[in-house]
C-alpha cells in the first residue's frame, strides 16, 4: 500500500534538496510552493481574485503577481495574509490532491512537500510527517545569503513560523540537516533503509 508522507521543516531548512533526493529514490513529490505558483499564474482565476481583492499594485508589468509587493504586504499585515490564503489555499489543495491521487493510483509513495504543514494543521492529511532539522543560526545564514536579507529580516522570517524544535517533537521522523549535502544524503538513506524503502545505504558516494 503506497504511503503519503508530509515533508516539512523551517524556512531555509533544506526541503528542496531533500525533495530532490527523495525523487531520485523513487518517490513522487507534490510541491505546495509549486502548486501555489500555479494557483496564481498569469491568466488564472486565482490571479484575477488577487487583483480584485488587493488592487492593481498586486500585478506586475508582465501581468503576473507582484511577489515582492505581496510578500511585503502579507508579512507586515497578518490580516492581509489571511485574505490571500483564503484565495490561494482552496486552489492549492485541489491541485495537490489531484496530483497526489494520480500518483497513488500508479502505486507510488508520495511526498507532500508542505512548508507550513503544522501551521496550517495538515498533519492529519498524511500518513506520516518527516521534519528536516537544522539550527536557527543555519537558517538565518542561508536566508541572508539566498534572499539577500539583513539579520533582522532573517530572524523575523524564522520566528514567524512554529519553531523547528517544536516541529521535530511533533514529527514521526526527523532528518538531520546540520551538516553538508553528503551528510544529509547519508541521514536520509539511513531513514529510508530503516523504514524499508531502500535495500541498503550507499555511504560516502555521490550520484
UniProtKB/Swiss-Prot annotation:
Its main location: cytoplasm. One of its GO terms (biological process) is coenzyme A biosynthetic process. The keyword ATP-binding applies. One of its GO terms (molecular function) is ATP binding. Pfam families: CoaE (PF01121). Residues 4-203 form the DPCK domain. Gene3D superfamilies: P-loop containing nucleotide triphosphate hydrolases. Keywords: ATP-binding, Coenzyme A biosynthesis, Cytoplasm, Kinase, Nucleotide-binding, Transferase. PROSITE patterns: DPCK. ATP binds at residues 12-17. Its EC number is 2.7.1.24. The keyword Transit peptide does not apply. InterPro entries: Depp_CoAkinase, P-loop_NTPase. GO terms for cellular component: cytoplasm. It is found in: Cytoplasm. Pathway: Cofactor biosynthesis; coenzyme A biosynthesis; CoA from (R)-pantothenate: step 5/5. It catalyses: 3'-dephospho-CoA + ATP = ADP + CoA + H(+). HAMAP family: Dephospho_CoA_kinase. Belongs to the CoaE family. Catalyzes the phosphorylation of the 3'-hydroxyl group of dephosphocoenzyme A to form coenzyme A. This is Dephospho-CoA kinase. It comes from Staphylococcus aureus (strain bovine RF122 / ET3-1). The lineage of its organism: Bacteria, Bacillati, Bacillota, Bacilli, Bacillales.
Amino acid at each position: 500500500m503506497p504511503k503519503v508522507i508530509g515533508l516539512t521543516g523551517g524556512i531555509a531548512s533544506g526541503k528542496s534538496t531533500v525533495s530532490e533526493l527523495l525523487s531520485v529514490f523513487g518517490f513522487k513529490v507534490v510541491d505546495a510552493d509549486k502548486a501555489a505558483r500555479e494557483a496564481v499564474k498569469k491568466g488564472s482565476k486565482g490571479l484575477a481574485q488577487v487583483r480584485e481583492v488587493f488592487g492593481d499594485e498586486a500585478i506586475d508589468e508582465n501581468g503576473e503577481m507582484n511577489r515582492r509587493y505581496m510578500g511585503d504586504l502579507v508579512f507586515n499585515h497578518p490580516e492581509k495574509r489571511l485574505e490571500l490564503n483564503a484565495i490561494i489555499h482552496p486552489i492549492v489543495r485541489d491541485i495537490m490532491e489531484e496530483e497526489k491521487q494520480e500518483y497513488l493510483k500508479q502505486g507510488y509513495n508520495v511526498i507532500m512537500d508542505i512548508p507550513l504543514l503544522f501551521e496550517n494543521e495538515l498533519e492529519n492529511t498524511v500518513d506520516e510527517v518527516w521534519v528536516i532539522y537544522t539550527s536557527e543560526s543555519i537558517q538565518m545564514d542561508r536566508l541572508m545569503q539566498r534572499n539577500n536579507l539583513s539579520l533582522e529580516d532573517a530572524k523575523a522570517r524564522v520566528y514567524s513560523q512554529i519553531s523547528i524544535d517544536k516541529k521535530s517533537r511533533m514529527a514521526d521522523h526527523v532528518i538531520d540537516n546540520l551538516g553538508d549535502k553528503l551528510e544529509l544524503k547519508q541521514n536520509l538513506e539511513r531513514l529510508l533503509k530503516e523504514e524499508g524503502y531502500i535495500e541498503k545505504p550507499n555511504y560516502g558516494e555521490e550520484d
